[in-house]
Design a protein with these regions (language model features):
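Surface-exposed loop/edge segments in extracytoplasmic proteins
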Residues: 20-26
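Short beta-strand scaffold segments in enzyme catalytic cores
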Residues: 11-15
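Short linear motifs in intrinsically disordered
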Residues: 1-7, 60-63, 164-165
């Protein structure tokens, strides 16, 4: 199992390998536009704290203003994966919650709030519309609000795509744990 932990209060995303060692650390924003219905975690709002599964990734060549170098799909932690993690000793049931790597949270929450998936992405199309305009494809672009997923700097996302590519190919389980509520950013 690879464990990706998004600590929204700190604005940070950490990637831990199967042995628990830190592989990658990056700035991240979990702030959403907040314009959607079904608050506080429905479409247009931030993802609920808890455990999720990374489902796959798409690499863009060339990068796009919306996603930067690519996007990583995030879905609810399904019952089969949850059972596999418990049976392997990688997770424990704690009442209604699940403990993974000493972090306790609910398993998923997307479906509960009318979502099927969200993404981890780079880019930020609003940057090109600012005065003066900023480059959404810059390696360390300003992190802007999204539709509720997580946004990384393009350089960090490019590295994360490289790190996770073999794991997706080998069908390694990749868990995303989202901690806390999002920080507030100044861009819509």
């Amino acid at each position: 199992m690879i464990h990706v932990v998004a600590e929204r209060r700190l604005g940070r995303l950490a990637v831990y390998g199967p042995d628990g060692h830190l592989w990658h650390l990056a700035d991240a924003s979990g702030e959403a536009r907040g314009a959607g219905m079904r608050a506080p975690y429905g479409p247009g709002n931030p993802i609920a704290p808890g455990h999720y599964r990374l489902l796959g990734q798409v690499e863009h060549d060339p990068p796009t203003a919306e996603d930067g170098p690519g996007a990583i799909d995030v879905g609810d932690l399904d019952n089969t994966t949850r059972r596999r993690l418990i049976d392997a000793g990688r997770a424990r049931v704690r009442g209604d919650a699940l403990e993974i790597a000493s972090l306790t949270g609910l398993a998923g929450g997307l479906a509960e709030y009318g979502r099927t998936a969200i993404v981890i992405r780079g880019g930020g199309t609003i940057l090109a519309h600012l005065t003066p305009p900023e480059d959404p494809l810059a390696p360390y672009q300003r992190l802007t609000r999204s539709d509720g997923g997580l946004r990384l700097h393009n350089a960090d996302l490019a590295r994360l795509l490289i790190i996770l590519k073999p794991a997706f190919k080998d069908e390694t389980t990749i868990v995303l744990t989202v901690l806390g509520e999002p920080r507030r950013t100044s861009l819509h």
